[in-house]
Amino acid sequence: MTSQTPQSGEIDDASAAPAQSLAGAKLIADYVRNLPPKPGVYRMFGEDGAVLYVGKARNLKNRVSNYANGRGHSNRIALMIGLTRKMEFVVTQTETEALLLEANLIKSLKPRFNILLRDDKSFPYILIRKDHPAAQLTKHRGARKAKGDYFGPFASVGAVNQTLNTLQKAFLVRTCSDSVYEGRSRACMLHQIKRCAGPCVDLIDPAAYDELVGQATDFLRGRSNALREDLQTRMAQASEAMDFETAAKLRDRIRAIAAVTTDQGINPDGVEEADVVAVHSDGGKSCVQVFFFRAGQNWGNQSFFPRHDMEAEPAEVLAAFIAQFYDDKPAPALILLSHEIEEAELLGEALSLRTERKVSLHTPRRGEKRKLVDRTLTNAREALARRMAESASQTQLLKGVQRVFDLTDLPQRIEVYDNSHIQGTNALGAMIVAGPEGFEKNHYRRFNMKGDDAATNDDFAMMKAMLKRRFSRLLKERDDGAPVPDLVLIDGGKGQLSSVMEIAEELGITDETGITIAAIAKGPERDAGREAFYLPGKPPFKLPMKDPVLYYLQRLRDEAHRFAIGGHRAKRKKQMTDNPLDGIDGIGPSRKKALLAHFGSAKAVRNAALADLEAVDGISRAMARKIHDWFQK
């Protein structure tokens, strides 16, 4: 996706600035006198300089003048006008460009009075990497830097893994990393269980492997029917030729393809590529449900809970969601909506400009597409009901946390810290965040710990180093609106708490922010339910075994532990799969393969004598010396 940057210019006329004493509607009226009748974006600022609202207009002068009129505003708009102390404006060439800029600014600035998309994150894709002679099938998230074909988005990693599993069975394309691929001297377990064709050890010729890759690509592009017919024809031919082994392999591949094309929770008949977006609102809260259909298949769904005030209408929420959701994602050719929105045509033009292809927004009234929308709307309604029930329960738990730790207010942000390592190796710290909405996974963070950070086999020093980095950054970013925790919970006992308090006092973090810092220590023999809690300057205490707050704090501690362990395992796995030959300049895939074929492993190459290295085909005397010297260092 190529992002289009609007050609715009800021209005920067000092003579147009209103008098410092003006505020609210009078201030806005003073701005209106100098505004042009052109499209653009406006920002409203409060007394503390924070952005209150970002809006766009086809005609800035007309749109902003509405705020100067003191009548007919909702309570939310009236409050916003009253708080306004400054405005800024950007003129754009078209209203479409204004809409794109507005969506971008709302996502980056998160103004108080705008409808905000929360829980936004990059979605996983399937990538067929083609920057290697044997293409690799893998999952991908983030920037598209690798050369290859991307397919998605998928609603979750689970949906990606399920599809990858099917693709392995049906097309036998490798999923291993390049370093593992280059290090193979015999086929791996995936080949033995018929999930890979074994290109790493030449069990399939390159042309035949490329054909498998092409078939996998066709499948992901929605050409599954033609592909299945071709495989069925080839299976019949193999049977007639009495080649029953080949026929059985083709049969298994056909079954794998059939499994993914028939196992759909929602019937996507007639919809090759579309997102179905539905909103349900109740009690001043909303859920937006999105189903992703690609290649005629349902690739999963996701729930979102935008932040907005009580007065927001469902169509208003839906329009704001669409603009922000596709701000950094490629939109499909068709977006089906549950509600009519006023600016559907303008949104379509903006998304077409950003995606560089035609994008249409449509609210179906009847037929198969309406059935898809209704099913999506049902999911939105059920998800919001669950969310509201969980929120009520969560509030009671947070009241308990407030009581246990003697907090002034109901905690809005709790940060929990843990670290993980094995005898100091692959050391890693982790922070998880919880609040009124439950676990806030888009705020989770991991901290790579190295020797210059702390003694990585010393839990106290690691915790101290991790919190020093976190608190230092917090002090720098606090004035820019960075979230400040109400409670910091450390997985550990009195020693860990003392180490962290040293850093907090050194940086003045408790005096500056009023953060409460506590520790949770496992009970004797690590028994759950016998945890002790520590607060600075107070004796340790325990909670009753059946106290719901105890269970909640255990869940927080366990989630931090899970997140830390997961990061440590990923780090350890990467270290184990990294090939030491990759670091030697001049050693490419062919030389690496020759060395591994000759010696059997990278460890044997490391221990090889210079004369043995010189005896390998394709390794010159100079290269042998280079390899030998590399490992000697």
Curated annotation (Swiss-Prot):
Domain GIY-YIG: 37-115
Gene3D superfamilies registered for this protein in UniProt: 5' to 3' exonuclease, C-terminal subdomain (1.10.150.20), GIY-YIG endonuclease (3.40.1440.10), UVR domain (4.10.860.10), UvrC, RNAse H endonuclease domain (3.30.420.340)
Pfam families registered for this protein in UniProt: GIY-YIG, HHH_5, UVR, UvrC_RNaseH, UvrC_RNaseH_dom
Keyword annotations of the record: Cytoplasm, DNA damage, DNA excision, DNA repair, Excision nuclease, SOS response
Ranges for domain UVR: 225-260
GO molecular function annotation: DNA binding; excinuclease ABC activity
Compartment(s): Cytoplasm
InterPro entries: GIY-YIG_endonuc (IPR000305), GIY-YIG_endonuc_sf (IPR035901), GIY-YIG_UvrC_Cho (IPR047296), Hlx-hairpin-Hlx_DNA-bd_motif (IPR003583), RuvA_2-like (IPR010994), UVR_dom (IPR001943), UVR_dom_sf (IPR036876), UvrABC_protein_C (IPR050066)
An example Gene Ontology biological process: nucleotide-excision repair
Main location: cytoplasm
GO cellular component, one term: excinuclease repair complex
Task performed by this protein: The UvrABC repair system catalyzes the recognition and processing of DNA lesions. UvrC both incises the 5' and 3' sides of the lesion. The N-terminal half is responsible for the 3' incision and the C-terminal half is responsible for the 5' incision.
PANTHER family: UVRABC SYSTEM PROTEIN C (PTHR30562:SF1), UVRC/OXIDOREDUCTASE (PTHR30562)
Complex and partners: Interacts with UvrB in an incision complex.
Family: Belongs to the UvrC family.
Name of protein: UvrABC system protein C
Source organism of this protein record: Maricaulis maris (strain MCS10)
